[in-house]
């Protein structure tokens, strides 16, 4: 059986516009509005498949660790599940602390604008010098980024080595725990974490409080069962998100050309 994403062909934005026509199932003689509407329509299959996969994995987590949770599983805290890591911000007044292609540096704003499950870079990267002059910490791929303030609870999975600003209390999963379990565990614990937050201006969960969030330690074989189930699903979701971003880039590259009249779609034979 072909991977789900292979059922849909993604346009290559490097192709000449005439060649792009054959990739997109539009009708003849269309308006700009109709053209843009159908580019937006192309996002739908990827989103639906991705959402369905997310619902399946969430349901399996609930089945294993909520509905059928073993009352004999020992109590523990997040500190027993993985390493809780804070972040830092290099001085904004030092331009040399930032780079176009440097160390990935994520802020809550990056997660608010991009609802993807996986993230590789934010709007800005920092330089090695900026990293050395801040309290930012390098975290490996598979780390679960968790925003700790304004708001609490943005969650994403690092696709590569990343750093964050101080608006995160991220979790590097222990090797015997794995990314998938910690990702869904944090989603499940969000009400508890919000209840442990404090602050007069805005609520924030401190590093100490985050480490002390209560949970349980399921049997290792159950965690492994869940990890094995999630591994191919997560890989599929990464591909779907990449293809969705590719379509977004296509739309964004064509929009100004359509609006300026550089591209005329009214007489295209699609």
How should these model regions be labeled?
Residues 25-26, 31:
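Ser/Thr/Pro-rich low-complexity tandem-repeat tracts
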Residues 6, 16-18, 31-33, 38, ...:
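Non-catalytic DNA-recognition/assembly elements of restriction-modification systems
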Residues 1-21, 25, 76-218, 269:
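DNA target-recognition domains and sequence-specific DNA-contacting regions of bacterial/archaeal
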């Amino acid at each position: 059986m072909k991977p789900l994403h292979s059922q849909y062909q993604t346009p290559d934005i490097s192709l000449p516009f005439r060649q792009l026509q054959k990739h997109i199932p539009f009708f003849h003689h269309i308006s700009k509005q109709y053209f843009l509407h159908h580019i937006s329509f192309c996002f739908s299959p990827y989103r639906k498949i991705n959402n369905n996969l997310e619902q399946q994995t969430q349901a399996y987590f609930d089945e294993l660790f909520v509905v059928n949770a073993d009352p004999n599983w020992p109590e523990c805290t997040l500190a027993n599940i993985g390493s809780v890591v804070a972040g830092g911000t290099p001085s904004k007044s030092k331009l040399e602390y930032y780079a176009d292609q440097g160390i990935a540096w994520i802020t809550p704003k990056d997660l608010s604008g991009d609802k993807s499950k996986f993230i590789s870079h934010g709007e800005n990267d920092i330089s090695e010098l900026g990293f050395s002059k801040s309290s930012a910490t390098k975290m490996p791929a598979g780390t679960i980024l968790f925003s700790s303030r304004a708001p609490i609870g943005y969650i994403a999975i690092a696709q590569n080595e990343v750093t964050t600003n101080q608006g995160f209390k991220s979790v590097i999963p222990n090797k015997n725990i794995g990314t998938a379990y910690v990702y869904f565990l944090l989603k499940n614990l969000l009400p508890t974490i919000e209840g442990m937050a404090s602050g007069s201006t805005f609520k924030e969960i401190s590093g100490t409080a985050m480490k002390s969030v209560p949970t349980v330690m399921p049997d290792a074989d159950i965690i492994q069962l869940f990890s094995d189930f999630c591994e191919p699903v997560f890989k599929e979701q990464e591909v779907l998100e990449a293809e969705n971003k590719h379509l977004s880039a296509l739309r964004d590259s064509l929009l100004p050309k359509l609006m300026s009249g550089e591209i005329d779609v009214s007489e295209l034979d699609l």
